[in-house]
Amino acid sequence: MVNKKINIALIGSGNIGTDLMIKALRSSTLNPVWMVGIDENSDGLKRAKALGLKTTHLGIDELLTHIEADNIQIAFDATSAYVHEENNRKLQSKGVKVIDLTPAAIGPYCIPPVNLESLLSQTENQTQINDGSISGNLNMVTCGGQATIPIIAAISRVQSVDYGEIVATIASKSAGPGTRKNIDEFTRTTADAIEQIGGARQGKAIIVMNPAEPPLMMRDTVHCLTQDEPDVEAITASVLSMIEQVQEYVPGYRLKNGPVFDGNRVSVFLEVAGLGDYLPEYAGNLDIMTSAALCTGEMLARNLRSNMSVKDSHH
């Protein structure tokens, strides 16, 4: 019983959904059963079918009729902020936990090394009081947020940060139609999470799509203004330790330069290489998003499993 995998569905068969599927198939706690899309010719759906998943191009309503029979407990939504709200409502009404990879930000923000554990312990407490509370949805912010907010949090846990600004540069080829439609949501959601989770008093986010050929690797720049003169040693140690934590689930996450100190400004320059699961290694923006979501899903699955074994032992 204890080793049983938790069945999951992937909503969205684009770059992010497909990369996530490939990673989830290697998971020891998650079992990908369904992939849902809206374009029957999408490469993601074809791959999912070839890999033995059940697929539909008729959108989420088709999946909803199979939730109970296939015992789907967690769904990962990699569609678009515009449709996430409706998807979330339908999934939660069936008792499915939702991990949101769009910038819709309905549920609380989740940046694994910063706040995943505290979110899940809150979730457990809430679940006991009132199942289906907001704990049923966790939002993974954005690829730029996953890459940079750990760094801002690493600085702000040492001393107060008045302002945090991030610039995420991604290869145009790695940005599918969903990402492109969500640019405004990307900047808003990331800036908000820089404040809420990163701990900066004010946050700003910029995304740049670089059309260069061959495609460039994901680059992220973080600038923070500290309230007082920065404590060089403490900030450097905190940032390096945070980078190691992120590397545990995103091996291609690297410090290119920094922390660089100039007056009250602290700058950190990062590069994120992907594992090359779906798109080549330049698409580190897919990996940081899907790896963070996978890590969150696996922790959630462990919680669901231990809750199930507790229930079983009460029978």
Curated annotation (Swiss-Prot):
GO biological process: catabolic process
EC number: 1.2.1.10
An example molecular function term from Gene Ontology annotations: NAD binding
Reactions catalysed, as given in the entry: acetaldehyde + NAD(+) + CoA = acetyl-CoA + NADH + H(+)
Catalytic residues in the record: C143
Signal peptide segment: none
Primary enzyme class: oxidoreductase
The entry's keywords: Aromatic hydrocarbons catabolism, NAD, Oxidoreductase
Residues that hold NAD(+) according to the record: S13, G14, N15, I16, S174, A175, G176, P177, G178, T179, R180, K181, N182, N285
Domain of life: Bacteria
Record has Ligase as a keyword: no
Family: Belongs to the acetaldehyde dehydrogenase family.
Name assigned to this protein: Acetaldehyde dehydrogenase
Organism of derivation: Shewanella woodyi (strain ATCC 51908 / MS32)
High-level lineage: Bacteria, Pseudomonadati, Pseudomonadota, Gammaproteobacteria, Alteromonadales
